Amino acid sequence: MIIPSLLDTDLYKFTMMQVVLHQFPQAQVEYRFKCRNAGVDLTPYIDEIRAEVAHLCQLRFTDDELAYLRGLRFIKSDFVDFLGLFHLNEKYVSVRPSPQGNGEIEISIIGPWLHTILFEVPVLAIVNEVYFRRTQPRPDLAEGRRRLDQKLALLKTPELADCVIADYGTRRRFSREWQEEVLLTMRRLLGPQLAGTSNVHFARLHNMVPLGTMAHEYLQACQALGPRLRDSQVYALERWAREYRGDLGIALSDTYGFDAFLRDFDLYFCKLFDGVRHDSGDPMLWGERMVAHYAANRVDPRTKTLIFSDSLDIPRVIELYERFHGRCRLAFGVGTNLTNDLGYTPLQIVIKMVRCNGQPVAKLSDTPEKTMCDDPGYLSYLRQVYSVQPAA
């Protein structure tokens, strides 16, 4: 089966899930799947996807896995005790053909946030792997290895010795086996230039650093959970700080557009959080504005970390490193370009939260095509509240 362990997911799912357990245990949510590739027919694979999801829902955390989580400094003991009783419930997820009969599939995940938050990453990995093992039954692994070696060689120059990257590629990987090979190759060829991986399963198996803090769903849910919509970003960051007391201090900057983030990310947050993550829009412009924002708030940018994670490849990593090296701390999360580049067109698939407690939620991405909401009226209202202009 494709998913061997409930740890085969991104670390930020657990860091967010802990906040949900402690602060929002009653929240009810809905997630929806979307494939952005035109003309891709996923309907022939529905039965296989359902079978893999059924297997996922049979998994439990082992004692060794729970001990590993307990050893992470930011994971609290009561959360690990909860995970010892936890399993994913199949009744919360449905996989079916689109009523439009256009080759698209509908995957919806509806239920308590606490009991559905761990579905997204493994379900996406399942869809990806089922699709590629059916469309590419004899993959050209030699080509994948050649491409990977070529990319990693770009980083092995003296002037890039401090350029560090991480694997963020679980959800859109070609296969679990390929992601593992990529990770081990990166460790062998990059050494200390590999910061770690977002995948907790592989981090545990191969003694790597697990990486991650928060995702958009956390900030989106706070639109419904906070006291006032305009204050929901501040509310989310303050609740995060209440949970982690300065640990896991990387804020995600594009849920309401970068202008709104800078308005909310005041002197207090500049000092409190260790840094900020970029996930949409022009990364060069974003980095310049972020460095300037720290300076304007009398915070030395060289003490803060800028993490870039939006559709990166290695040449782009190098460009960003050369632009900002010495001006701030830097980290780069590379996903699909590492874990799904064997010469085939990767699937552009996402699962996004669309409702919380019966209310629509959305993100106003700095890359307009990433915006996903099933209620145009709410999206318009959200833009008005956060002074974000709709894309032309």
UniProtKB/Swiss-Prot annotation:
One of its GO terms (molecular function) is nicotinate phosphoribosyltransferase activity. It catalyses: nicotinate + 5-phospho-alpha-D-ribose 1-diphosphate + ATP + H2O = nicotinate beta-D-ribonucleotide + ADP + phosphate + diphosphate. It comes from the Bacteria. This is Nicotinate phosphoribosyltransferase. Catalyzes the synthesis of beta-nicotinate D-ribonucleotide from nicotinate and 5-phospho-D-ribose 1-phosphate at the expense of ATP. Transiently phosphorylated on a His residue during the reaction cycle. Phosphorylation strongly increases the affinity for substrates and increases the rate of nicotinate D-ribonucleotide production. Dephosphorylation regenerates the low-affinity form of the enzyme, leading to product release. GO terms for cellular component: cytosol. The modification Phosphohistidine is found at H216. Keywords: Ligase, Phosphoprotein, Pyridine nucleotide biosynthesis. The gene is pncB. NCBIfam families: NAPRTase (TIGR01514), PRK05321.1 (NF003704). GO terms for biological process: NAD biosynthetic process via the salvage pathway. It comes from Cupriavidus necator (strain ATCC 17699 / DSM 428 / KCTC 22496 / NCIMB 10442 / H16 / Stanier 337) (Ralstonia eutropha). It is an enzyme of class 6 (ligase). It holds the Pfam family NAPRTase_N. Pathway: Cofactor biosynthesis; NAD(+) biosynthesis; nicotinate D-ribonucleotide from nicotinate: step 1/1. Belongs to the NAPRTase family. Its EC number is 6.3.4.21.
